[in-house]
Every structure is written in structure tokens, then in C-alpha cells.
From Swiss-Prot:
Top-level lineage group: Bacteria
One Pfam family this sequence matches: Ribosomal_S16
NCBIfam families on file: S16
Name of the protein: Small ribosomal subunit protein bS16
Keywords: Ribonucleoprotein, Ribosomal protein
Organism: Campylobacter lari (strain RM2100 / D67 / ATCC BAA-1060)
BP GO terms, sorted: translation
Amino acid sequence: MTVIRLTKMGRKKRPFYRIVVTDSRKRRDGSWIESIGYYNPMVEPEVVKFDAERLAYWKSVGAKLSDRVAAITSK
């Protein structure tokens, strides 16, 4: 199953996340199909950038959103 979830980037105690499309069987930081955006919770206000067209495309072909991705993309 294809999922859209966060993969952790950044350094120790300074997390930064990519919003990626991947197979659900892959590890969190494993290989991914496409990167569609990023999320930075460490700055004020939080920065969320993603390609809405690509998100809509992947949802239309059956990709599931993780809970956290669903929450941050609905803002």
C-alpha cells in the first residue's frame, strides 16, 4: 500500500521532516517514491510547504495519509 508520511531529517534535537510518498512496508527513513513537501516544527510559526497538486494526485490513486500528515495539510 502506498502512504504519504513524514521522514525525519535535520540533526539531533532539531528535527525537520520531509513529506514523502512511500510504500508502507519501507522503514520511516528508507527509500521513497516522491518528496512532495516539508514540515519544520522548530520555527515560530511552524513552516509547512507541500505541492497540493501532487498530494491530490497521490490521494486519487489510493495513497493513504498518515495521521500527522493529514493534520498538518488540513491547516
